[in-house]
Amino acid sequence: MLLSWLTVLGAGMVVLHFLQKLLFPYFWDDFWFVLKVVLIIIRLKKYEKRGELVTVLDKFLSHAKRQPRKPFIIYEGDIYTYQDVDKRSSRVAHVFLNHSSLKKGDTVALLMSNEPDFVHVWFGLAKLGCVVAFLNTNIRSNSLLNCIRACGPRALVVGADLLGTVEEILPSLSENISVWGMKDSVPQGVISLKEKLSTSPDEPVPRSHHVVSLLKSTCLYIFTSGTTGLPKAAVISQLQVLRGSAVLWAFGCTAHDIVYITLPLYHSSAAILGISGCVELGATCVLKKKFSASQFWSDCKKYDVTVFQYIGELCRYLCKQSKREGEKDHKVRLAIGNGIRSDVWREFLDRFGNIKVCELYAATESSISFMNYTGRIGAIGRTNLFYKLLSTFDLIKYDFQKDEPMRNEQGWCIHVKKGEPGLLISRVNAKNPFFGYAGPYKHTKDKLLCDVFKKGDVYLNTGDLIVQDQDNFLYFWDRTGDTFRWKGENVATTEVADVIGMLDFIQEANVYGVAISGYEGRAGMASIILKPNTSLDLEKVYEQVVTFLPAYACPRFLRIQEKMEATGTFKLLKHQLVEDGFNPLKISEPLYFMDNLKKSYVLLTRELYDQIMLGEIKL
């Protein structure tokens, strides 16, 4: 009898297992992911209830006591243990305690390249309870001044290699801002932080200076990339840092991992997911001053790297390198980041071995995020019923002509169906606050949508168009500002760029729309960089786009460039290209026009340009 029951039970379990695999193939993946999210929420709730947070800095100090000799940062072959970083950052804190009027809550701007002192200064100021504003090291002159003014700092700390950048704006800085340089010899008007560090004590700083009780407390300002306008100082709260620092853990990283960080530390990916993520785990990071495709794998082998951070272009640059022997001879098991194209993803895995690519979606200023924890190629993440309850987001229809969300006759926004691109919006409430930007409230207000589904509700407009498929995987479609309309259809620039990028002589493709008198919408144009030692095959470009793209999405114009403007995280800038248009009198670089009769692209001459502008050639 017992044997019969056990047989029936066993058979039932097998049937249930196969039914689960058939009907709910991602059940256990979803379950474990949601469980991790719930654990993070429970931890944050405990902090709130207790009225005192355990911040990333607190966790770092705990590691410095428990594992003082463990390497925290490896930089250019030098090892900085948790204890080393603790003592050096305490020296920084004592310099400002003894030689400045900085107090808890004051803002200090930090302009420094990737180096250990970036972390020393950041953590040292955090020990004083200061808010640190990370400045983009690529900006200059008035743009730099605007960023400094936007975050309203009491002090500015500058790396040795960037003092020249600041020297030219010193006369324009407010007298209330003290400028500190990480160099013995500094320009007039700058205080040598390096000199004072040599005599500063490394004693612990009293915790009273940096104790935090509110999750909503501001701890950082991180500037947006500026791809859609001037960079804005996003307010980063303790809540956002604690959430972001858990990403490595959520993807399966442990204290035994060695994380390779090549992205700029002024960016949230490297600072919050990378450095803070290592602190969360008690792990080691290998810090690179600047990403180098040629040195990447040799560094990974040299330092036994097991995890690295990427943005999509980084992986593409690695795939563009000449093939070498032993490319799979490394210990890397995880690649964590965002923006990798499907074709690059496949090529990367095929070429560099069994590395799990962990794609995610997040924005500097947003509280919403998605994680691709199943490894589905091309997806930025996945959602399910339980995650939707924890993270309130929606995908709504977007009007590309009016450049705003569509609304029905009652004035409410409209949900998209699965498989359709929709504007990603996130509910703003006490559970998912939006902290906005420093400076004029208009910057914050412009990101909010009101009365979306009912009177009084408020949503954050991410500006990203996302597609949710039938299996609940999410895919990035385009930015609202990048998508343009032509022939009554919406053209996704990322899709067009991906198709052109498949050609073996194309290194880079940046797609945008240009206005033409007499036509509604914008005609597609692609700026292209060729691979070294290759030539442009215009017939192949034509064949590629007409084969893989609908007629309305095929670029009407090509522009050949040697170099493209990009942000510090390799996002291609389009604004100037759009402004330039396709006028051969204004552009010295080669321009080409799509000729359907010749089934090729042809040189865009002054005569052709005039014919297009006069309407003699129809597009």
Swiss-Prot record:
Membrane disposition: Multi-pass membrane protein
TM annotation in the entry: 22-42, 119-139
Family per record: Belongs to the ATP-dependent AMP-binding enzyme family.
Localization per record: Cell membrane, Sarcolemma; Cell membrane
EC numbers on record: 6.2.1.15, 6.2.1.3, 6.2.1.-
Organism per entry: Homo sapiens
Protein function: Mediates the import of long-chain fatty acids (LCFA) into the cell by facilitating their transport at the plasma membrane. Also functions as an acyl-CoA ligase catalyzing the ATP-dependent formation of fatty acyl-CoA using LCFA and very-long-chain fatty acids (VLCFA) as substrates. Plays a pivotal role in regulating available LCFA substrates from exogenous sources in tissues undergoing high levels of beta-oxidation such as the heart.
Protein name per the record: Long-chain fatty acid transport protein 6
Tissue spec: Strongly expressed in heart and localizes to cardiac myocytes. Expressed at moderate levels in placenta, testis, and adrenal glands. Expressed at very low levels in kidney, bladder and uterus.
One of the GO BP terms on file: long-chain fatty acid transport
PROSITE patterns xref list: AMP_BINDING
Main localization (coarse): membrane
InterPro entries given in the database record: AMP-bd_C, AMP-bd_C_sf, AMP-binding_CS, AMP-dep_synth/lig_dom, ANL_N_sf
Superkingdom of the organism of origin: Eukaryota
The keyword Glycosyltransferase belongs to this UniProt entry's keyword annotation: no
GO molecular function: arachidonate-CoA ligase activity; fatty acid transmembrane transporter activity; long-chain fatty acid transmembrane transporter activity; long-chain fatty acid-CoA ligase activity; nucleotide binding; very long-chain fatty acid-CoA ligase activity
Name of encoding gene: SLC27A6
Signal peptide: none
UniProt catalytic activity: a fatty acid(in) = a fatty acid(out); hexadecanoate(out) = hexadecanoate(in); (9Z)-octadecenoate(out) = (9Z)-octadecenoate(in); (9Z,12Z)-octadecadienoate(out) = (9Z,12Z)-octadecadienoate(in)
Keyword annotations: Cell membrane, Fatty acid metabolism, Ligase, Lipid metabolism, Lipid transport, Membrane, Nucleotide-binding, Transmembrane, Transmembrane helix, Transport
GO CC annotations on file: endoplasmic reticulum membrane; plasma membrane; sarcolemma
Binding locations of AMP: Y221, I222, F223, T224, S225, G226, T227, T228, G229, L230, P231, K232
